[in-house]
């Protein structure tokens, strides 16, 4: 995130937007109420990076906050505070998601369990985005752009693999491997998610 904008797309195949604090509500036309741990400078840098990568035709992948930021970039809005999805006593919650046909369905099936550690979520979906997975309460859990190489999940696959793997949730390594392997091979891959 701290690399010069002009150099970043040239030196990378994929931009990964990780989790973190809340997206500042000013970026989607709202007042601060309910948002916490805001870093406006980070928001501005990451929004600019996404724009740079997309202009170069490169892939953008978001995790948690990354999904929220992508939604905002395309004109969507966020619920500033939802209940039932944040960590409890420092531990991720678990819940089921339901998927539409596509990458997630191919990897994990129509219904599977993921972790949850967020309190912001998609409210209005950004232009050109489509929902790929939802929680039972309707919370958007995965999105992709209809024509650009953009894909994002609300959960943390990096906290569901390796030493952090859980027997009661999906293997996050399957998703991360598929995204990174395929996005390096083809700019068209993420358009098909």
Task: Please identify what each model-predicted range represents.
Residues 1-63, 72-73, 79, 83-108, ...:
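N-terminal beta1-alpha1 cap of cysteine-dependent amidohydrolase-like domains
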Residues 67-69:
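Hydrophobic, aromatic-enriched interface-forming segments
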């Amino acid at each position: 995130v701290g690399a010069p904008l002009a150099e970043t797309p040239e030196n990378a195949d994929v931009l990964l937007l990780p989790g973190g604090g809340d997206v500042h509500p000013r970026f989607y036309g709202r007042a601060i109420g309910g948002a916490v741990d805001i870093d406006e400078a980070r928001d501005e840098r990451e929004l600019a990076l996404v724009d740079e990568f997309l202009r170069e035709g490169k892939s953008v992948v978001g995790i948690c906050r990354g999904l929220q930021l992508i939604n905002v970039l395309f004109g969507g809005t966020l619920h500033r505070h939802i209940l039932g999805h944040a960590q409890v006593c420092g531990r991720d919650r678990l819940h089921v998601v339901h998927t539409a046909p596509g990458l997630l369905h191919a990897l994990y099936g129509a219904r599977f369990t993921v972790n949850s550690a967020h309190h912001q979520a998609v409210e209005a979906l950004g232009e050109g985005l489509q929902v790929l997975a939802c929680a039972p309460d309707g919370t958007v859990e995965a999105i992709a752009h209809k024509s650009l190489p953009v894909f994002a999940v609300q959960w943390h696959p990096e906290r569901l693999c390796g030493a952090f793997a859980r027997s009661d949730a999906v293997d996050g390594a399957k998703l991360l491997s598929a995204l990174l392997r395929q996005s390096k091979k083809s700019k068209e891959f993420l358009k098909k998610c």
